[in-house]
């Protein structure tokens, strides 16, 4: 059996040269609310944002954008003041998890979520949080997120749900 038949998955930080491939994936999955080129470039350039790329056989297959926030639940004010997000905050919000349609169902989203969880654990953050539509709830629950109900975010016309993954390795203040 040839080794080139085994898929090679690589996770890495995004670089500016990736933005065109990212834009294609963004358009495929978020056509009505896709981020523009300037936003994608800003996300890549921002030091306080984790922008992870999943490559399958050296082709960009998906990405995850996460930013550190101070609250378990994302508010409109936090979105509007994203320049104030800091690395040493309590939670990381997942702004985008997007896989190219050609590569969906191969576990790349789960790998990106696992990498994001590792970052949160390394930073001693309390966890990850995100909002999603009802059809994605079971996917995130499969990845150990807890559905905390309908989001009170006012930046979307759709009904969105708040989901949280709590860091199981975080030492609680009242524990010995």
Question: Where in this protein do the model-derived segments appear?
Answer:
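Active-site rim helix/loop that mediates acceptor-substrate recognition in acyltransferases
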Residues: 30-60, 65-84
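Conserved catalytic-core motifs of GNAT/GCN5-like acyltransferases
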Residues: 69-71, 131, 141, 146-162
């Amino acid at each position: 059996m040839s080794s080139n038949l085994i898929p090679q998955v690589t996770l890495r930080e995004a670089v500016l040269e990736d933005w065109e491939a990212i834009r294609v994936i963004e358009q495929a999955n978020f056509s009505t609310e896709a981020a523009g080129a300037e936003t994608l470039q800003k996300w890549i350039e921002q030091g306080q944002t984790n922008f992870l790329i999943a490559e399958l056989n050296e082709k960009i297959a998906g990405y995850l954008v996460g930013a550190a926030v101070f609250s378990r639940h994302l508010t409109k004010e936090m979105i509007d003041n994203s320049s104030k997000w800091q690395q040493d905050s309590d939670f990381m919000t997942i702004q985008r998890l997007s896989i190219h349609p050609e590569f969906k169902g191969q576990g790349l989203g789960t790998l990106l979520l696992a990498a994001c969880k590792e970052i949160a654990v390394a930073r001693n953050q309390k966890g990850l949080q995100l909002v999603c539509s009802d059809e994605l709830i079971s996917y995130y629950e499969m990845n150990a997120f807890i559905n905390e109900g309908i989001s009170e975010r006012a930046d979307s016309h759709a009904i969105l749900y708040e989901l949280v993954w709590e860091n199981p390795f975080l030492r609680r203040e009242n524990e010995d």
